[in-house]
């Protein structure tokens, strides 16, 4: 009887290791070489079998840190195309060329001479200077250079906005003095445009005040002497 019981137990163990589902199982030996107790205790409460079916801990996947930042917004088509002909820049540009072409005249020598002679008859009591408006003063960057003699005497150290007065209205114009020369830049174009001052006209600039620095302008237009 004892032999039969041992044989049955052996057959059970043999079937266990012949099970196809456990064909990849490996026998685990104790990690301590001095230990003589086998880790595999067999079927039913066997630590070996339990180790095969023991739920393994899932490997932790490393967390990928996302870079924080603002998402790029899709550009507004209307904002992207703000420089198209419908935009303000294009409209201002077209106005500039229209006004420039309108003020660009075919001036004869006789007409120019008449305007210059008329300006010479006007002699203010305050310091003044005369300028015949050239195309470069009106169209190419809209910068006008002042006579060096007047600039050295009255504009030395000026670097900022002064006022040009024509009639009852004043316009701020940037004046820059450097190395004996002075020029009008920002605001000069608006002044000539609003007062319809064009090529060949003669302007007389009279110094009214040095504290706020106001220059009164008297314009002698060539079309008045045609």
UniProtKB/Swiss-Prot annotation:
Any one Gene Ontology molecular-function term assigned to this protein's record: DNA binding
Main function: Involved in the regulation of vernalization. Binds to DNA in vitro in a non-sequence-specific manner. XLG2 promotes the DNA binding activity of RTV1 specifically to promoter regions of FT and SOC1 in vivo and thus leads to the activation of floral integrator genes.
Protein origin, superkingdom: Eukaryota
Cross-referenced SUPFAM superfamilies: DNA-binding pseudobarrel domain
UniProt protein name: B3 domain-containing protein REM19
Keyword Zinc attached: no
Annotated source species: Arabidopsis thaliana (Mouse-ear cress)
Gene that produces this protein: REM19
Tissue distribution of the protein: Ubiquitous.
